[in-house]
């Protein structure tokens, strides 16, 4: 895993026990999972809108910025639920080389 993701995972874990007024992430943890999920949803919408703008303008700088926000808040969500970013990378690695149809067919039926 990249050094950046590892370092970020360590910081996110450390912020779980920090005072809410000490950092943005600590304040999110203090507000609870629903607030974190709200931020993930907000950043998802902003990323989609930035992609539409990038397609029209050819400038992807805002798309990259918003995608970083989405990834960051997704990592906060994972950490709040006790998951490390490596779990997502492991899942992507598991899927690598599978066709989309084969991956979908292999999913458990619910």
Swiss-Prot record:
GO cellular component term, pick one: cytoplasm
Transmembrane as UniProt keyword: no
Similarity-based family: Belongs to the PRA-PH family.
Reaction catalyzed: 1-(5-phospho-beta-D-ribosyl)-ATP + H2O = 1-(5-phospho-beta-D-ribosyl)-5'-AMP + diphosphate + H(+)
InterPro entries linked to this entry: HisE, PRib-ATP_PPHydrolase-like
Protein origin, superkingdom: Bacteria
Pfam families: PRA-PH
Name of this protein: Phosphoribosyl-ATP pyrophosphatase
